[in-house]
Design a protein with these regions (language model features):
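Secondary-structure end/capping motifs
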Residues: 225, 231-305
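Pocket-lining segment of extracytoplasmic ligand-binding domains
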Residues: 147-257
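Short helix-initiation/N-cap motifs at beta->coil->alpha
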Residues: 33-44, 96, 134-174, 314-324
Length: 329
């Protein structure tokens, strides 16, 4: 019997490596893997539906899924997760504490990006800064004129300006024409070396650890989506995809735990791994709904409150039904 030929777009992460190097197979499938940047993957997936299986922005997925317009159905495989305290940059010459952002101008590449949804949630829940309290300035990080991937219908109190033509938000931050900058990537160009530009939180790692201890939330950035028609035609496929991605992640964690020779080109990996386990627990990068319900509930609540979801999505309608339970031996 021939295998199902599929295209798979994903990032080049250690947790995916056993898939694309062939050590882990997706049962019943003959995949063609494409390792792409998030920006390219998400743009092509949402604009032209280029892939059978693809990594997706959790926020973009939720916008489309809540409207019944998404060509993909997600499985609870969370390829990217991050505490977004390091995503908030400010002009240190005028912003000393989070509350100083009230009434100010903050640059963003797109309003609906997952990282920015989480950053706004942090600012609102922990510091009382609502999305309506600032003016959002939308533009490219490195290149001028970045468009919003998805048409949005935002609440009337949200104020969004476009960066001046030919200008990036990194340049605006460097010149002091905006007060803050929130993005999945650091500001580029001269802003990186500007002594007046820095993180809002002086010790973002300590702040993030405190956030996790208080909330139990490890923010989810990306999910895996399967073309709806494929998932409907081959009902075994969502579970097979989830199983394969889970096995690949397990291989990556096994290698990371092998300290006989460092697998990552970075010092202090063993200490960081120990710190992650002490703070987040042994299964610190879990897939599946049950161990991530608190994080999923927080995100869907904020996503709807920020005017991005058409309705407040229930957790049991986010993913393919076959992926909410798993077998055990």
């Amino acid at each position: 019997m021939s295998k199902l030929q599929i295209s798979v777009a994903m990032g080049d992460y250690d947790r995916n490596r056993a898939l694309y190097d062939g050590r882990v197979q997706i049962d019943g499938c003959d995949p063609v893997y494409m390792l792409l940047s998030p920006e390219e993957m998400f743009f092509r997936a949402m604009r032209s539906r280029d892939f059978d299986i693809t990594e997706l922005s959790f926020s973009s997925y939720l916008v489309k899924h809540s409207r019944g317009e998404c060509p993909y159905i997600a499985v609870p495989v969370f390829l990217s997760r991050a505490f977004r305290h390091t995503s908030i940059y400010v002009r240190k010459d005028r912003i000393k504490i989070p509350q100083d952002l009230r009434g100010k101008r903050i640059g963003i590449p797109e309003y609906q990006l997952t990282a920015i949804v989480w950053a706004r949630a942090i600012l609102q829940d922990d510091h009382g800064i609502a999305p309506e309290d600032v003016t959002w300035v939308r533009g490219g990080i490195d290149t001028p004129g970045r468009p919003e991937k998805i048409k949005l219908d935002l609440p009337p109190g949200v104020k969004i300006d476009s960066a001046p033509e030919g200008t990036t938000i990194s340049e605006l931050l460097d010149r002091g024409e905006i007060d803050g900058f929130i993005a999945p990537r650091a500001p580029s160009g001269a802003a990186l070396n500007n002594p007046q530009v820095g993180w809002l939180f002086d010790d973002p790692t300590a702040t993030a650890k405190d956030y996790y201890r208080r909330t139990g939330i490890f923010p989810i950035m990306h999910v895996v989506g399967i073309r709806k028609e494929l998932a409907q035609q081959h009902r075994w496929l969502p579970a097979a995809v989830m199983k394969a991605f889970g096995e690949s992640k397990t291989r990556a964690l096994e290698l990371l735990s092998d300290t006989s020779a460092t697998k990552v080109t970075l010092p202090f990996v063993e200490e960081q791994l120990k710190a992650a386990r002490e703070t987040l627990g042994a299964d610190f990068w879990s897939y599946g709904v049950a161990p991530n319900r608190r994080t999923l509930e927080a995100f869907t609540r904020h996503h709807f409150a920020q005017g991005l979801s058409a309705r407040h999505m229930a957790i049991d309608e986010l993913f393919d039904p076959s992926t909410y339970e798993s077998y055990s031996i």
